[in-house]
Amino acid sequence: MATPVLEVRNLTRDYHTSGGFLRPAKIVHAVKGVSFTLQKGKTLAVVGESGCGKSTLARMITLIDPPTAGEILIDGAPVDASHVTREMRQKVQIVFQNPYGSLNPRQKIGDVLAEPLLLNTSMSSAERRDKAMAMLTKVGLGPEHFNRYPHMFSGGQRQRIAIARALMLNPSFLVLDEPVSALDLSVQAQILNLLKDLQDEFGLTYVFISHDLSVVRYIADEVMVMYFGDVVEHGTRDAVFGNPQHAYTKTLFAATPKADVESIRARLERKAALAG
């Protein structure tokens, strides 16, 4: 079997809280011994309610926070949490829920996309511009958007820009942290379709953090369910959705409103066909 793009072994994250008057200090076990592997070109969805540990896990695998214990391997190479190299950081990129918060409002979009190349490569200005322009096209925008500012775009367009920026350094995998939860349903479907198209074209690998099970069912190859820092269920999408084993997974599914993303996609395709 090929070397996994991402391998996580017994990953743990503890937080120490200070005590107070009549309140002893304690340790919060946010993530408890999580292990998984992720192959190239696949999508692992990490799901669970707020406080389950999925965002803490995301911060560790994006090398933002060090684990308390355990090991992370990217492309087969172990990550030294005490000394994360620039090359290792380039291998993983993250797309946040709110792209506007991660875009400099005083920076033109072309400069936003070219900046990672300026900081991390020896490309000339013309080469950086050409690659940024090409990436804009890949995410469904055009040359006319190159010199515009973030406030001039819709939420869906800004998320396309965030995805484009994350891909500029050809990372080994992307962490997508609730990337469509702030968008309207029709725009959600467009962004999900874009992510799938990019994955097919470039062989991208995703860790998809979400609480929206209808979105997870559409995008994921594998599903990992977290509950208070533990992984309580992990399997293929069809296995987890078709025959959930853990009581928490069953409860989570029963409590989640269902949005038919497939019908939204079909409706958009019909509309596009009529317009053409």
Give the positions of each predicted feature.
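ABC ATPase NBD coupling module
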Residues: 20-25, 78-93, 111, 119, ...
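Helix-to-loop junction immediately C-terminal to a conserved catalytic motif
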Residues: 62
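Conserved ABC ATPase "signature" region
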Residues: 126-144, 253-254
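Conserved ABC ATPase signature
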Residues: 149-153, 157
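A short, proline-enriched helix->beta-strand linker immediately N-terminal to the Walker B motif
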Residues: 168-172
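ABC ATPase "signature
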Residues: 234-235
